[in-house]
Amino acid sequence: MLAIFLETLNITAPVFAMLFLGVLLKRIDWINDNFIHTASSLVFNVTMPALLFLGILHADLHAALQPALLIYFALATLASFALAWGWAIFRCPREDRGIYTQGAFRGNNGVIGLALAASMYGDYGISLGAILAALVILFYNTLSTIVLAVYSPVIKSDPWSICKSVISNPLIISVIAAAPFAWFKIGLPGWLETSGQYLAQTTLPLALICIGGTLSLAALRKSGSLALSSSLVKMIGLPVLATLGAWLWGFRGAELGILFLYFGSPTAAASFVMARAAQGNHELAAAIIVLTTLMAAITTNVGIFFLQWGGWI
């Protein structure tokens, strides 16, 4: 357990380093709101699609394709989304419901979830986690686009407009484009893959610096209760329900452990990028990311300990 706890800290500490760097750079006026807006757009349209494309390109789709696991994960994700949105309707002002919902169901599986899966289960964790990550990207971005479109002042919410928003989402386009390359094991020219890696490697630091640049004590106080509520749903409520459902479904061992890690991951940095693109309450999105990442160091270890104590993983 100490090794898992230290692994979690090794993953979350760099995240907070980038967040606090963003706070510092904004405080000393080395970055401003214009930079944050432009950089967030760059991440959403260019660097994050490159990261997702390369991540799927390198996944072994043949080795870890488990239909039952994928079906359960898809159903549990849809149920989590519905529960989070339903709770937001009763809990939030209308203009914040999309941001609240996205923060409560969208996990950082591509970074923290996958890293912990690899730490616990080695190559098997990487291959199975990568397959789930591909499904996650498609579901999370589609559902996030839908819920943000319903409440966004700049995104139309009629069915055709929502469909267009989903289809034209750069993150979804990158996932769909990468799938045949991964399935048929088609490589990219060396120079092109290296160039893509350069872009991909800027994604997380740049996104986190932008998040840190938006943080302020006033913003945290303003969105404190909503951010805390969404964070509790994300880190305690939904992971408990989803993991219990997986246990009842019959999953044990590595499959149950990886499902827990994915459902228990903190809110993804991409939620801030999409919130800003939709002209939503990005300060609330940033606060949820910070709170859930803090909570993850505790909830992940407690959950793993409990599952190991019960002999289920």
Give the role of each language-model region:
Residues 1-313:
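Alpha-helical transmembrane segments of multi-pass small-molecule/ion transporters
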